[in-house]
A protein has these predicted regions:
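Alpha-helical transmembrane segments in inner-membrane proteins
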Residues: 2-352
Length: 352
């Protein structure tokens, strides 16, 4: 058998795999668009597609009914939908990256302490500085998340085992426990902080305007760019540090850029929405099942899946207790816990 005869089936197989992945990305984009339209229509007051269109594009009109529809769509549901998509992309990509860099199949973005850092910053801002609005404490939350990520990375980079994924995980766990204890102590001593933290911790995309979404999206976009830059080296790191080093990868630089990307993505999303557990863990596993271990495909899939899942969970939360609402962070946790248990039971953990 000639070499050419062997190469042709392999080439056809690679082409077919690429075609399936492209089709899959297109399907996810289509599902996301349908979900966005549904998100604009579903709520305490259901809107028809025609009313959604009017709410988006109709010119200002003295008609009270049309004015009410415009207010619902443009002021409430459009920002909510955009934030669900942006935060879902950030948490999905962050989940895929953290599993890759730690080679830990059950790692989530909370491993870097960003959730506990953001929570600590929120209660500090409310209790010490008297912050009352999301626009005020969202920036404190982002700074807290970023600071926690820096501390975790710094602790994991010194002493014996520096740069080891296990050291990173242990440092993250230590910082998380410490900040969680501090957060609880402050919240229990200040009723206003406790009430604000209780609602923020549920994980919600409601009540946040474009004055917050716009700046947060800039940090998320920066994180996405850094994530895309690291994908080739992340594929090589997946083969092991020694192999990657032999192929010319600057391991320290790659991990540093990756951790910065994860901190930007998870920190900004958590600051805007509150902590949303299990999302990054779930979508990274689903993306790996659909695409295989190639991070050039896995990361885009994880981002789109994160957006779809968070958007769908937000819609479900509006429907199940209508006319009330269930925060999407709660719905994601209700889905994520059984998913995690199923992974454990079936032994589906694969090295990231």
């Amino acid at each position: 058998m000639s070499t050419t005869a062997v190469e042709r089936p392999a080439s056809r197989g690679a082409t077919e795999a690429r075609r399936r992945r492209v089709v899959g990305l297109g399907a996810l984009v289509a599902v996301l668009m349908v979900g966005a339209v549904a998100s604009l229509a579903v709520g305490a007051r259901a809107l028809s597609p025609a009313e959604v269109w009017q709410g988006l594009f109709a010119a200002p009109d003295p008609d009270r009914r049309l004015t009410e529809i415009r207010l619902i769509v443009q002021t409430v549901r459009v920002p909510r939908t955009v934030l669900a998509i942006v935060a879902g992309v950030a948490l999905g990509i962050g989940g895929a990256l953290i599993q890759g860099y730690t080679r830990n199949p059950i790692a989530d973005t909370g491993l870097l302490g960003v959730n506990s850092g953001a929570s600590f910053a929120v209660v500090t801002g409310i209790a010490v500085f008297g912050f009352t609005s999301p626009f005020q404490y969202v920036w404190f939350a982002f700074l807290g998340a970023a600071a926690a990520g820096v501390v975790v990375f710094g602790l994991s980079s010194i002493g014996r085992g520096a740069g080891n994924p296990l050291t990173l995980a242990l440092a993250g766990q230590g910082v998380t426990v410490f900040l969680a204890a501090m957060t609880t102590a402050i919240a229990l001593s200040d009723l206003k902080s406790l009430n604000a933290l209780r609602f923020w911790n549920a994980g919600s995309v409601a009540g946040v305007g474009f004055d917050v979404i716009g700046p947060v999206s800039v940090f998320i976009a920066a994180g996405v760019v850094l994530a895309l830059i690291t994908l080739p080296s992340l594929n090589l790191l997946d083969l092991g540090d020694d192999v990657a080093r032999g192929l010319g990868v600057n391991i320290a630089l790659s991990r540093t850029v990756g951790i910065v990307a994860i901190t930007l993505l998870a920190g900004a999303a958590t600051a805007a929405c509150g902590p949303i557990a299990f999302l990054g863990l779930m979508v990274a596993h689903v993306a790996r099942h659909l695409t295989g271990p190639d991070y050039r495909w896995l990361v885009p899939y994880a981002g789109l899946l994160g957006a779809v899942v968070l958007l769908v969970c937000d819609i479900v939360g509006r429907l199940v207790v209508r006319p009330g609402e269930l925060d999407p962070g709660v719905v994601v946790a209700l889905l994520g816990a059984p998913f995690f248990a199923a992974l454990v039971r079936r032994g589906k953990f694969r090295s990231a």
